[in-house]
């Protein structure tokens, strides 16, 4: 892998390595502390922390997803594969893959795996199958069970519960290699929310920036959690994906401190990429008649909430927030051809604009 500090391996690669090590230990009694795993990108050497035979025809292996430069909740997790070697009695699959403790189960449609199956995604399944078939005797079947002892606990920190994946985390990966701060991996996880909502035939979807927006939306709107789509910082990406899937209109709900960036054409709201909140607020305050003294106060403010207090003092709060909401709506129509119902709120969930449709209230 290039630039080792910035790449790691996926849970799918570790699961494959453990499966391969367990099978090798059944076929060869020598100690196994490293295996070569063929991924869609390249062959990787994966260290095995423990491997032991359970019987003449079964074994288990454990490996950890080693740290790399990424805030990944699965880093450091132990992944276990138990392999049982059976006599082949039919022309069916030679490698049977299932899940154990800590691997989630699919309970809702719209995902890559059918309802009722363990959340071991297609690429990891193929990796396990292809790597094991290289050394599997033709007259045998390998039954592989993947377990993640801490998976149930870690799952609470992921989007799995929202997506209907219960009881643990998912075994994922598309290339076998995890890249530092990989926007692709994160995007792949959040866009799944749209697929699940569409599979459930839900109308009146509500897009929010994150957990705070979701909490406030559930408090203020007549909707369920399933209607809510979190965009994270990737607002533009999520809107593009919604449009690709035939969604033309929805509600965009959230704290003005996040949503105001969209009024300025900033569709990735990560602070390090762009801010502009103060400048956008000042522009709309000026449009709505704020004098120079008020504009200077806004410029000197540290937070969006402080700016709202200043607008309140000048009785400009509603006009400015309506202007910002309209700008957000216009930006999204121009960029994505989306008709948004924009609702701006403060940290308490109080509505800041009133130029929105009220069908969800």
From Swiss-Prot:
Family, as annotated? Belongs to the CbiD family.
GO: which molecular function terms? cobalt-precorrin-5B C1-methyltransferase activity
Origin species, per record, is Methanobrevibacter smithii (strain ATCC 35061 / DSM 861 / OCM 144 / PS)
Which reactions are catalysed by this chain?
Answer: Co-precorrin-5B + S-adenosyl-L-methionine = Co-precorrin-6A + S-adenosyl-L-homocysteine
Enzyme Commission identifier(s):
2.1.1.195
Disulfide pairings: none
For this UniProt record, the keywords arranged alphabetically read as follows: Cobalamin biosynthesis, Methyltransferase, S-adenosyl-L-methionine, Transferase
BP term (GO), one: anaerobic cobalamin biosynthetic process
A Pfam family (short name) is CbiD
Protein's UniProt name? Cobalt-precorrin-5B C(1)-methyltransferase
Its domain of life reads Archaea
Please name the taxonomic classification of the source: Archaea, Methanobacteriati, Methanobacteriota, Methanomada group, Methanobacteria
State the pathway, as annotated in the record.
Cofactor biosynthesis; adenosylcobalamin biosynthesis; cob(II)yrinate a,c-diamide from sirohydrochlorin (anaerobic route): step 6/10
Q: What class of enzyme is it?
A: transferase
């Amino acid at each position: 892998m290039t630039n080792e500090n910035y790449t790691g391996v996926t849970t799918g690669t570790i699961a494959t390595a453990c499966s391969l090590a367990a099978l090798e230990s059944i076929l060869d009694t020598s100690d196994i502390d490293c295996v070569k795993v063929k991924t869609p990108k390249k062959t990787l050497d994966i260290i095995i922390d423990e491997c032991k035979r359970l019987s003449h025809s079964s074994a288990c292996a454990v490996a950890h997803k080693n740290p790399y430069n990424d805030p990944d909740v699965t880093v450091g997790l132990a992944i276990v594969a138990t392999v049982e070697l059976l006599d082949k009695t039919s022309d069916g699959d030679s490698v049977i893959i299932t899940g154990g403790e800590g691997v989630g189960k699919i309970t809702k449609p719209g995902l890559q795996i059918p309802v009722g199956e363990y959340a071991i995604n297609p690429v990891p399944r193929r990796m396990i199958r292809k790597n094991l078939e290289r050394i599997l005797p033709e007259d045998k079947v390998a039954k592989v069970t993947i377990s993640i002892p801490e998976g149930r606990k870690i799952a609470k920190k992921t989007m799995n519960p929202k997506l209907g994946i219960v009881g643990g985390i998912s075994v994922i990966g598309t290339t076998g290699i995890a890249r530092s701060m990989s926007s692709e991996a994160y995007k792949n996880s959040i866009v799944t929310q749209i697929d699940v909502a569409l599979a459930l035939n839900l109308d009146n979807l509500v897009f929010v920036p994150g957990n705070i927006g979701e909490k406030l939306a559930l408090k203020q709107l007549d909707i369920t959690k399933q209607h809510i789509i979190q965009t994270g910082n990737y607002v533009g990406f999520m809107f593009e994906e919604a449009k690709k899937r035939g969604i033309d209109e929805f509600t965009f709900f959230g704290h003005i401190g996040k949503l105001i960036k969209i009024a300025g054409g900033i569709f990735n709201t990560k602070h390090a990429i762009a801010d502009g909140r103060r400048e956008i607020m000042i522009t709309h305050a000026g449009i709505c008649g704020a004098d120079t003294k008020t504009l200077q106060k806004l410029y000197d403010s540290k937070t969006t909430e402080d700016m709202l207090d200043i607008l309140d003092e000048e009785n400009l709060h509603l006009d400015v927030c309506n202007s910002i909401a309209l700008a957000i709506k216009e930006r999204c129509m121009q960029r994505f051809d989306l008709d948004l119902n924009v609702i701006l709120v403060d940290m308490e969930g109080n509505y800041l604009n009133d130029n929105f449709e009220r069908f969800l209230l």
